[in-house]
Amino acid sequence: MLINDTVVAPATNISTQAIALIRVSGSEAFLIVNKLIKDKKLEEKRGLFLRKLYFEDELIDEVVLSCFVAPNSFTGENVVEIACHGGILNTNKIINILIQSGARMALRGEFSQRSFLNGKIDLIQAEGINNLIHAKNELALKIGVANMSGSNNKAIIELKDNLLDIISRIQVSIDYPDYDDVEGSSIEDLTNLLEIINDQINKLLMRSKMAFKNSEGIKTAIIGQTNVGKSSILNALINEDKAIVTDIPGTTRDIVEGQINLENVSLNLIDTAGIRKTSDVVENLGILKSKNLINEADLVLFVVNKENINDLDNQEIFELLKNKTYILIVNKAEKLSKTEKQNLEKKYQNIVFTSAINHDIDQLVLRINQMYLNEEINKNDELILIGLNQITLVEQIKNKLSTALSIIKSGMPIDIVNVDLYDAWNLLNELIGVEYEDEIIDNIFRKYCLGK
């Protein structure tokens, strides 16, 4: 893939703001920007410069230019970043003039793509930048920063090197069958080495899938009888009146959705119809949906109050919650005495007390964060991948290694093993971008922001 033109895009949101940043990158970056400068033309050198921009002798703006000379820039190309006065009209006008002067409007993620293609960052770092920008919670932010910096990427390099070592040992035994006493080349040795790599890949996949789910959002159903405060819980969590809150039983007949981003996890919240005995056909459809959502949800927030906790309808819900991850929420806790709370804590597991109408849900938020505080995905020195394409590649690597292990343990000819090991090694190269297809790379970077 060869990209040799010069591109421009806003690096900040185009809106009514004090300052906007416009990025120009490519071999002709200085030449194009100089077309807008009358006096003190830019030289190809690094620095900060104050200049006035003109178009057809009309003063457009007074700006600060941050200049970088290839290869010492983010993209590896000549780069001029224009800090101009903000505003939709002003920012767009400068961009349009730069396009008329020879630049092309950059595609989404094209600056990061150029950085990757010019060897400034690998593919894991590139995806880390995107993860950082789109992080919904502290966990995703932490993973994005770690992957962007490349601090944990050596794990993939080590896996590649170790796998190549096994491939080489097998190849030696194939090419020189008489030398069967080469150290570390016995079937037992190769199996042990391969199992170590397989275990590392399995752990990477486990961490990554868990972190991906926490980052994208856990499907969370808020269930309970009518008028116990389910909608108040939803509104308190997302800090907006998305669900109708009244004293009339059966107000929420359908599904209401919202999202909340906590420290360790994001929740995709679903407020469901209250579960009760009713002859109302429409309400019964909502109740059936509520019961089905219990099976589909990753986490259930089961809301009760002190008056109805032992009702038969709630006992039915407790039965549905067997083998499910759930939190029992006793709402309207302001009506409970300290002794009543202690007695309930002794009787029920994973219980919290809230007063959602007063927005007192601290216990609930703390409990959810604790539940999803996983040591495996909170280690600072472990590689975690949360891009869907990355996780798919790791799954493919896992499958190739599993097949290779099955072959070597079955006693089949050793040369057959190398086919799957070579495939796994090539997939590791694809993971960090040593090998890639142009269409796949385009697809990855088009998911990025314009200007990045």
Swiss-Prot record:
Pfam families: MMR_HSR1 (PF01926), MnmE_helical (PF12631), TrmE_N (PF10396)
Any GO MF annotation of the entry: GTPase activity
One Gene Ontology cellular component: cytosol
Keywords, in A-Z order: Cytoplasm, GTP-binding, Hydrolase, Magnesium, Metal-binding, Nucleotide-binding, Potassium, tRNA processing
Record-listed (6S)-5-formyl-5,6,7,8-tetrahydrofolate binding positions: R23, E81, K120, K452
Domain TrmE-type G intervals: 217-373
Biological process terms in GO annotation: tRNA methylation; tRNA wobble uridine modification
Function, in words: Exhibits a very high intrinsic GTPase hydrolysis rate. Involved in the addition of a carboxymethylaminomethyl (cmnm) group at the wobble position (U34) of certain tRNAs, forming tRNA-cmnm(5)s(2)U34.
Stated family: Belongs to the TRAFAC class TrmE-Era-EngA-EngB-Septin-like GTPase superfamily. TrmE GTPase family.
HAMAP family, per the entry: GTPase_MnmE (MF_00379)
Subunit: Homodimer. Heterotetramer of two MnmE and two MnmG subunits.
Identification of the protein by name: tRNA modification GTPase MnmE
Native species: Mycoplasma mycoides subsp. mycoides SC (strain CCUG 32753 / NCTC 10114 / PG1)
